[in-house]
Every structure is written in structure tokens, then in C-alpha cells.
Swiss-Prot record:
Name under which the protein is recorded: Gamma-glutamyl phosphate reductase
Organism whose genome encodes this protein: Geobacillus sp. (strain WCH70)
PANTHER family: DELTA-1-PYRROLINE-5-CARBOXYLATE SYNTHASE, GLUTAMATE SEMIALDEHYDE DEHYDROGENASE
Subcellular location: Cytoplasm
Keyword hit for Transport: no
Molecular function (Gene Ontology), one example: NADP binding
Enzymatic reactions: L-glutamate 5-semialdehyde + phosphate + NADP(+) = L-glutamyl 5-phosphate + NADPH + H(+)
Protein family according to the UniProt entry: Belongs to the gamma-glutamyl phosphate reductase family.
Enzyme type, top EC level: oxidoreductase
Length: 413
């Protein structure tokens, strides 16, 4: 039996124990994990630096290096996420519905764990801890498969978490890392029916497509983020500039960063916006009108409208009205996060009704599409599909339900 099957068997057994634990037992284990991560922070950073150095040698893009790199601040954010998950209400056992039939049968629908979750992700070590904490809180065991570029970091994080669990009620086997990062091992993982209850891919378009096309295990799809902001004719100048700068520059390498800004052609502050972006080092790719009006704006190609740059690059386009903006977003968007900056309620209402996306914003940055920002604690991913879960996926997104039927001897006639 190879490494993967051994770990899958261990996960199955651990999931059975996890499903029976109390909220207090799970929270105590999460607190131990948070404390251990802080205690082992320097070692984790040393292991992460090995990955970062190797990534630079191999020519990883600045965006990927940024996602890969851990810092003191980022580890503290990860630990805060674990503690927040411990503080959140436990959805397991929650009564979703309850009713009594005319024949006296009392029926309850309650939340239960999914079982064993397989996480497939790229160079994001924070996902290792985020996924583990959310899974443990909801009584799920988790098989983690990160990228080879983050292997030192992931091994360190999983080691610290497993050691922290050894003195808790949660079996250490409830967290497993697939250290074989080969394509063959990944393909085997995608077909672990009977061991894994669901796969959750979290990463770029290529990774997600690979999982969807090759998996026989059910997939809970997360999506890439070609996010848009539409600046309406009535948008306040400083609000619009501040939101666009935040959505593009606060952290360009993440999926909720804005990639295209659509501007109403009659908005009076177009020059101020594009000149501010240019001064802040953003490479602008615009439609023919903008490219001919500003020497620092490159002519956009058709592919620019559908590109998730994950870098300080922004596509910009003038539109005649909110309908043209909506049509553009529905054509090129990835159903992730879309925003309108406007003081016209009718336009906001139309934007919200007409756009097919997981999260829509009025007068706010797209950067808020995040489990922690939504109050979920850490997130397992951001779903852009419509079945089971959509948007930032917190605790409830990785549960399912079962029905409990209480009778007094009823038989069906």
C-alpha cells in the first residue's frame, strides 16, 4: 500500500472519531495549534525561506513569490484565523429545520461533517493552516496536497499542527499532507472515491481545470478572480479613486484584486484616476479612446479583458452606461467579485440584479471577498459555482445535513 492509501485509511479512521467530539474538545485542540504555531514561528519561517529561495532560483513570478512567502505578520494573521475559528459557533449538530408530520413523526434536519476533505492548492502555505482549522472545527479530517514550491513550508506547518494534536482529543491522523507532489500522486488522489468525500481545489485556472477534468471524487470548485469595478457617472471622486487603488494595489496577487475598471464616459474625473494609478506604478491597458488620450496607457488586446493579472496591471475601458458595464462583466467576468461605485440607486439595483457573480459590492472594494472579512474566520476557499456553496466558504460550507426521524411506533400504510 503506497503513502497515499495509508494516509487515506488513517483519515477515514480519524474522521469517525472527529464526528463524535464535543465543541469544547475541538476548540481546545485548535487553541493548542495556535499556541504551537507561535512557539515554532522561527523554525516555520526558516523552512519557508528555503521555499522562497528555491522559488526565486526557479524563476517564479513576483506574484507567486508573494503568495509563497511567510512573514512574522502573516504567521500572526494565520494564528489569529485559527483562534477566530475556535471562537466561532460550531455548526455541527445545529438544527436546520424541524417539523412534525400529521402522523406524529417528528423530523429534524441537522448539520453533520462531510467526512474527509481533500484540499489541492498551490504556493499558499496559509491555506495549509486555514483548511486544517476549518476542517477540524467542523469534524472533518483533511488531506492536504500543496505545490512542490511550498513543500518545506507545508511539511513544517503540518508537523507543528500534528504535534499539537497529540495531547488533544483530536487524532493527529486527522491532518495528513501528501508529500509526493508528482502528477501521478495527484491523479491518484483525485480518484480516491470511498476515501475522500469531496475535493476542493484552490489556485489558478490551470490547477482548477486539472482537478475538474480528472477527478472522480466530487469537486467543490473555487474560481479565478477576473474582478471588475464600474465607476458610474455619479460616483464620488475620492471614493472611487480610493476604492480602485485599494482593490488593485493593497495585494495585487490575490483573487479578489480588481483586474478591470469600467468608467462611465461622462464621469468628470477620468484624468485624475488614471494619472493617480500611473503615478502609483500601475501599468494601464486601455481601450482605443483612452490609449489615444494618454501616452502612458497601452492599447488593450482582446485577451486583456479576460486576464487575471495578479500583478500591478489594470485594464481600463470607457462605457456609455451601466448596461454596457454589466454586459462586459457578464461576458468576461469569472463570477467572483464585482463592484459598482455610484450614487444612483436605480443603477445599483440593476447592477445587483443583472450580474451573475458570487459577491457584488456597492461603494466598497472587492478585497473584502474573504472569509475573515465576512466574519467566517479563515476560509476554505471562494466558490464561484452555484451548487452546495457560493462565495467565501466558511464553516457551514464544509458541512452537510442528515435527517433524524423520531417516531412512536408508526408504520407506513
Amino acid at each position: 500500500m503506497n503513502e497515499l492509501l495509508i494516509k487515506a485509511e488513517q483519515l477515514q479512521q480519524a474522521a469517525k472519531t472527529l464526528a463524535l467530539l464535543s465543541t469544547e474538545e475541538k476548540n481546545e485542540a485548535l487553541t493548542r495549534i495556535a499556541e504551537a504555531l507561535i512557539k515554532q514561528k522561527e523554525w516555520i519561517l526558516q523552512e519557508n525561506e528555503k521555499d522562497v529561495a528555491l522559488g526565486k532560483e526557479q524563476g517564479l513570478s513576483p506574484a507567486l513569490i508573494d503568495r509563497l512567502q511567510l512573514t512574522n505578520e502573516r504567521i500572526e494573521q494565520i494564528v489569529d484565523g485559527v483562534r477566530q475559528v475556535a471562537d466561532l459557533p460550531d455548526p455541527i449538530g445545529e438544527i436546520v429545520e424541524e417539523w412534525t408530520r400529521p402522523n406524529g413523526l417528528r423530523i429534524q434536519t441537522i448539520r453533520v461533517p462531510l467526512g474527509v476533505i481533500g484540499m489541492v492548492y498551490e504556493a499558499r502555505p496559509n491555506v495549509t493552516v486555514d483548511a486544517a482549522s476549518l476542517c477540524l472545527k467542523t469534524g472533518n479530517a483533511v488531506l492536504l496536497r500543496g505545490s512542490s514550491s511550498a513543500l518545506h513550508s507545508n511539511k513544517a506547518l503540518v508537523h507543528v499542527m500534528k504535534e499539537a494534536l497529540r495531547d488533544s482529543a483530536i487524532p493527529a491522523d486527522a491532518i495528513q499532507l501528501l508529500e509526493d507532489t508528482s502528477r501521478e500522486a495527484a491523479q491518484q488522489m483525485f480518484r480516491l472515491n470511498g476515501y475522500l468525500d469531496v475535493l476542493i481545489p484552490r489556485g489558478g485556472a490551470g490547477l482548477i481545470r486539472s482537478v475538474i477534468e480528472n477527478a472522480t471524487v466530487p469537486v467543490l470548485e473555487t474560481g479565478v478572480g477576473n474582478c471588475h469595478i464600474f465607476i458610474d457617472e455619479s460616483a464620488q471622486k475620492q471614493m472611487a479613486i480610493d476604492i480602485v487603488l485599494n482593490a488593485k494595489l493593497q495585494r495585487p496577487s490575490v483573487c479578489n484584486a480588481v483586474e478591470t475598471v469600467l468608467i462611465h464616459q461622462n464621469w468628470p474625473y477620468i484624468s485624475e484616476l488614471v494619472e493617480t494609478l500611473h503615478a502609483r506604478g500601475v501599468e494601464l491597458r486601455g481601450d482605443s479612446q483612452l490609449a489615444s488620450s494618454y501616452s502612458f496607457i497601452q492599447q488593450a488586446a482582446e485577451t486583456d479583458w479576460s486576464t487575471e493579472y495578479l500583478a500591478p496591471i489594470l485594464a481600463v475601458k470607457l462605457v456609455q452606461n451601466v448596461k454596457e458595464a454589466v454586459d462586459h462583466i457578464n461576458r468576461y467576468g469569472t463570477k467572483h467579485s464585482e463592484a459598482i461605485i455610484s450614487e444612483q440607486n436605480d443603477n445599483v439595483r440593476f447592477f445587483f440584479q443583472a450580474i451573475d457573480a458570487a459577491v457584488l459590492y456597492h461603494n466598497a472594494s472587492t478585497r473584502f471577498t474573504d472569509g475573515e472579512q465576512f466574519g467566517y474566520g479563515a476560509e476554505i476557499g471562494i466558490s464561484t459555482q452555484k451548487l452546495h456553496a457560493r462565495g467565501p466558504m466558511g464553516l457551514r460550507a464544509i458541512t452537510t445535513t442528515k435527517s433524524l426521524v423520531y417516531g412512536t411506533g408508526q408504520i407506513r400504510s
